């Protein structure tokens, strides 16, 4: 049955959702965290998942709002799994520049469908250079199955996870082998773009991104996010390099108190100059990630037959799931990283 033939979702309550609700969620006190390798930083990933809840129609909103703290806190679990699981790291990126030469269009060269890409490059090659668009498609199918089973644990786990991968796909530096500027003398740009700029400026962004919409072609949606990110990559690198020429080293970097330690970081002045010259890019990519996350949750639910989630409300995550998450957190803090690090 096509989406158009499904019953229309009642949006009236959604439309009555006042701006006050979103302002309340933005007043949530986020601890400033610097992850070792997380796209958007832990701060950004949590905010993306949290605000995505407010894009949902009434049929999903009640359930997701009830579990908004879980979805927020566990938005970073996929990055933690990079410390615990082989095969996780490549789910977070795709090095498009390994597939094309200057002047070529990677999006006409790389097949979008997994089987066609495997036939052209081999699975080992794809895994080596990252699989994020295909993994988003896999995660959507897992979430859809969780809705079909009406399994609260799996709905929550896969909702949090897919939000993370979608967030990663909206980051330009997750589409290149030069993911941390290490090939162009710009080491550290990864954390600058996705963490430092967000932590300084996120409270000034406009998060009224509209309502979640059904995604007709999930794989194409994932690829479109990657394409938009990659199209911005040249500006990310070029503008930082140009700006560096205007700042003496002692003006580009500074030291800040982080907990009990004093750590080096990009200065506030350099960060703000970079953010300004990017001309809203970080905010645009974050807004696009938020609406895509909400739309993907909605799409998985629709494709599962629109199960009545009100029947699942007041059902907390199981102790088994919470124990699994605590074990993952312990492995993360123990810290044997499996995959690339962006410091």
Regions found by a protein language model. Name each.
Residues 8, 49, 170, 174:
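Alpha-helical and His/Cys-centered functional microenvironments
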Residues 1-42, 343:
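Bacterial Sec-dependent N-terminal signal peptides
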Residues 160-168:
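Extended, hydrophobic/aromatic-rich amphipathic alpha-helical segments that build helical scaffolds
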Residues 31-161, 177-269, 273-287, 291, ...:
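N-terminal, motif-rich segments that launch catalysis or mediate targeting to/interaction with membranes
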Residues 167-181:
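Catalytic Zn2+-binding segment of zinc metalloproteases
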């Amino acid at each position: 049955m096509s989406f158009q033939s499904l019953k229309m979702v009642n949006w009236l309550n959604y439309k009555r959702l006042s701006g006050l609700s979103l302002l309340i969620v933005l007043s949530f006190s986020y601890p400033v965290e610097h992850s070792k390798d997380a796209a958007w930083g832990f701060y950004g990933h949590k905010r993306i998942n949290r605000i995505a809840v407010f894009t949902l129609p009434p049929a999903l909103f009640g359930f997701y709002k009830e579990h908004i703290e879980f979805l927020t806190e566990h938005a970073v679990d996929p990055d933690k799994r990079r410390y615990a699981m082989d095969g996780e790291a490549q789910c977070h990126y795709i090095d498009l520049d390994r597939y094309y030469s200057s002047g070529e269009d990677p999006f006409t060269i790389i097949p979008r469908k997994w089987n066609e890409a495997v036939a052209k490059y081999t699975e080992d090659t794809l895994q080596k250079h990252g699989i994020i668009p295909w993994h988003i498609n896999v995660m959507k199918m897992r979430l859809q199955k969780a809705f079909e089973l009406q399994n609260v644990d799996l709905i929550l786990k896969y909702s949090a996870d897919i939000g993370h991968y979608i967030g990663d796909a909206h980051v330009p530096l997750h589409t290149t082998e030069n993911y941390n500027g290490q090939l162009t003398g710009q080491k550290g740009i990864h954390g600058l773009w996705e963490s430092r700029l967000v932590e300084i400026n996120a409270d000034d962004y406009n998060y009224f991104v509209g309502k979640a919409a059904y995604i007709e072609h999930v794989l194409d949606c994932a690829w479109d996010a990657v394409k938009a990110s990659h199209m911005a990559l040249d500006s990310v690198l070029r503008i930082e390099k140009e700006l560096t020429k205007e700042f003496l080293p002692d003006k580009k970097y500074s030291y800040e108190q982080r907990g009990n330690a004093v750590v080096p970081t990009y200065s506030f002045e350099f960060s703000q100059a970079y953010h300004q010259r990017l001309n809203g890019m970080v905010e645009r990519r974050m807004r696009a990630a938020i609406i895509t996350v909400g739309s993907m949750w909605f799409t998985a639910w629709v494709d599962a037959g629109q199960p009545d989630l009100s029947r699942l409300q007041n059902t907390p995550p199981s102790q088994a799931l919470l124990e699994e998450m605590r074990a993952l957190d312990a492995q993360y803090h123990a810290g044997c990283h499996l995959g690339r690090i962006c410091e």
